[in-house]
């Protein structure tokens, strides 16, 4: 049993964590604060968290924010990393179950492979919150905390369209891991925007025969997207991304270079791909997308090496995940504004908004919102 003061301390942390989700444009606005609970929880927050890897800055940020929020409120939390290994991920879940957790927050390395771990948690009476990436092909998922992943891809497509005049622009497509459901959602969003402009000749696909074969289709099935992603996957790996980009450039004639437009699936791969294109003497200019607003990519944007990123304010996502966990611990149901089909069920969800960041609004979106400090960067506009 814990005191009301502990509950109020927790909710205070949630409010702080959810502050200032920036608006897209020259000014930043604040994200809604989490609703105050009417009753204190009856037990300590028994939550285990499993994140995919320590090798990407994004997940280290999430670890820090989860740990800071829960520790400051007086709760113990254990955060384990799967390091890109689904077997280790399952072992992590089993270890947390053995410690008596009541709620599992898990960002799966492989959405389909994680189904077995989710089912084991469900069998133990644990509520399962799929965090940022969706666990697929199982009914053992209670809730999905995510950003609007389709909107992320649409932001990429719209940015490239806004910077393309005329026709015949060289387009290079890259994607995340084929094992990650989000990679499909991001690609779906990008295709939603780009396909009409591919069909009318604004863009010409240069690095995927599968995409060329499907370019007349406004809506792709998952199987069709899988064919394209299979050709252009980076597997979320910076080295894979760089090697693939270099291979594409080696195979491309000079006419397929010049000014190029590039769909890159996240900031780490965007930097690697941008470096490869920048090093090619036949590439005169490039526009490249990204997401996660990693510090290194924010600096790349300031320096003109990366064109844009999509800010997904993990403070809001962490706060939403904790709020959902608290709701389950109190015997209630988290707020729902949407559902995502995971191949087996429609999973309740509350997707958070995203913000497009370019050099024009980087200060408002990143610095003025409090997401990062100005001292983290040089040459801010």
Locations of regions flagged by a protein language model:
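A residue-level marker of the well-folded mature domains of exported/periplasmic proteins
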Residues: 3-4, 25-381
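C-terminal motif of bacterial Sec signal peptides marking the signal peptidase cleavage site
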Residues: 18-23
